[in-house]
Amino acid sequence: MKRWILILAGLALALAASAQETILDRLKAANTFDTMQLSFVQTRHSALLTKDLVSEGQMVLASPDRIRWEVLKPYPSVFVSSGELTPSGRRFRMPTEKDFTATTLEGEDLTVKLVPVRRDLKSLFREIIVHADKQSLQIRSALLITPDGDWTQLEFKDFVVNRPVDAKLFEKE
């Protein structure tokens, strides 16, 4: 799950590279920030479970590599990363537009289907479908589908961009 959170933080870059050149610049501008705070609802579906798991929380991002992912309910938990090494001892590399092939889909929102190119990402995802608001171009939701068909839907709201963030939020408790 922790890798998924870090990968999500890089989705703005992948989404930005997914469309035509005029959209590309607008998406990059809309999803470039020094800090971002938002609320999320996460729905996880697994063939092994009889019922989907739904959780709610908040995420705080600060450029270039700080993230706080806090689940508030039903089971409170906090994940904090400030550019640390992965368990394998290597620095995590944020995905970029070169790590996915992208297809723009028709619909009410700007919808982009991302298919991973890197082997390590292919082991995590079959595809990622990202929805962005056509006006603001902010990412509103992401559907992450695993190779076995399980999925996680993330819905984002209450965006606050480029406001000061307390550095203590990124300290491990």
Q: Where is each model-derived feature located?
A:
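Bacterial N-terminal signal peptides
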Residues: 7-14
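Solvent-exposed coil/turn segments that connect beta secondary-structure elements
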Residues: 41-45, 64-66, 72-75, 82-86, ...
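A short, surface-exposed loop/turn module that caps and links secondary-structure elements
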Residues: 49-59, 104-106, 116
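An acidic-aromatic
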Residues: 54-98, 152, 158
